[in-house]
């Protein structure tokens, strides 16, 4: 059902703000040292994060999602659920066809909405840089269990590609940007191109590709079964294994009881050499998702698709979203990455 890779490529991860680890690496022999990682604690996590952002994701992550209204609201990309809608923002300058960034909100797979991003920001900056933006909703775990969420995400990509001419979009230049739960989904978009069992072709436009050409993963959960062990020995709560955790609710059972299904939520199990380039970011003080989750994803991708196609940065002192991700400098880093592959 899925492919596994033994990861031997190891990257030293300095914790300076926005340190670029994988971009520009040369082909020298990898070091045998382990990645340097700052261990997050509940005390180091911003108080407001613990108060308003349940694992993994939640409302309030981004102060401003967009200052402009969508050009098109509630476009239905499938017809099985009222949740299967997207908002589309089109730049007001430029002639197009425009490259597209699909934004996938966070919220622990339990809540969040396309109108607020739930952990995302940057619509204004994307529009100014000449990108169309499609912010999607998907079925949440109280309505449908996994793989409905990745089915919906892929259906949205196929819908946009099928209707690219109508909306003046470039069907060959699609990126995906997600935060927290959305980070997991965009990482799957970037690694499961052509994986039939995760396609959900019955949702429509089956003749279209659901592949994306660039991925921005903000602090997404990657390996559900490893999270509590990775938090062991820290003051961060280790509750992902609980029967009522967001991850267990996503798959419809305690995660330890359905390891084969849980394995299909892990992007690292699908990495191949033709995967999309990735920008991966997390905070060093994230007490919701262990920072090593995204470090491991970056290393696994780098070993297979090449270090030049993977950029990893760790934001010193940042938690699970928040203002550190929203700075002009960091948003420009995202735009620069997307420009490299989509413009």
Model-derived regions, located:
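Alpha/beta-hydrolase active-site loop
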Residues: 144-165, 332
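N-terminal cap/lid segment of alpha/beta-hydrolase-fold proteins
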Residues: 53-96
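Conserved alpha/beta-hydrolase "acid-adjacent" motif
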Residues: 287-296
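Primarily recognizes the serine-hydrolase "nucleophile elbow" in alpha/beta-hydrolase
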Residues: 155-232
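Mobile cap/lid helix-loop segments that gate and shape the active-site cleft of serine hydrolases
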Residues: 61-67, 191, 195, 226-270
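Short amphipathic alpha-helix adjacent to the substrate-entry channel of hydrolases
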Residues: 115-134
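Short beta-strand element of the alpha/beta-hydrolase
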Residues: 97-108
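Short beta-strand/loop motif that positions the catalytic acidic residue
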Residues: 274, 279-282, 286
């Amino acid at each position: 059902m899925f492919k596994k890779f033994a990861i031997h490529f190891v990257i030293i991860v300095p914790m300076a703000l926005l340190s670029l680890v994988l971009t520009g690496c040369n082909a020298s022999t990898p070091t045998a040292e382990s990645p340097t990682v700052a261990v997050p604690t509940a005390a180091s996590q911003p108080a407001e994060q613990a108060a308003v952002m349940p694992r993994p994701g939640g409302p309030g992550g981004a102060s401003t999602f967009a200052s402009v209204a969508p050009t098109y609201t509630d476009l239905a990309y499938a017809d099985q659920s009222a949740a299967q809608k997207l908002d589309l923002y089109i730049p007001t300058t430029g002639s197009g066809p425009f490259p597209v960034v699909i934004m996938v909100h966070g919220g622990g797979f339990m809540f969040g909405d396309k109108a607020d991003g739930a952990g995302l920001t940057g619509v204004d900056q994307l529009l100014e840089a000449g990108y169309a933006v499609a912010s999607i909703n998907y079925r949440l775990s109280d309505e449908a269990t996994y793989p409905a969420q990745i089915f919906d995400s892929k259906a949205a990509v196929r819908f946009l590609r099928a209707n690219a001419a109508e909306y003046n979009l470039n069907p060959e230049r699609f990126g995906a940007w997600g935060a927290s739960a959305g980070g997991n989904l965009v990482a799957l978009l970037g690694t499961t191109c052509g994986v039939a069992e995760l396609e959900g072709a019955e949702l429509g436009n089956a003749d279209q590709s659901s592949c994306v050409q660039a991925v921005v993963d903000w602090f997404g959960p990657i390996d559900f079964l490893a999270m509590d062990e990775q938090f062991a020995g820290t003051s961060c709560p280790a509750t992902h294994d609980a029967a009522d955790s967001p991850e267990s609710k996503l798959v419809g059972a305690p995660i330890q009881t359905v390891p084969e299904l849980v394995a299909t939520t892990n992007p690292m199990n699908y990495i191949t050499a033709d995967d999309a380039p990735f920008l991966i970011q997390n905070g060093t003080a994230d007490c919701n998702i262990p920072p090593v989750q995204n470090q491991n994803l970056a290393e696994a991708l780098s070993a297979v698709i090449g270090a030049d196609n993977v950029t990893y940065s760790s934001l010193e002192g940042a938690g699970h979203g928040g203002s550190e991700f929203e700075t002009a400098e960091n948003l420009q880093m995202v735009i620069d990455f997307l420009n490299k592959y989509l413009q």
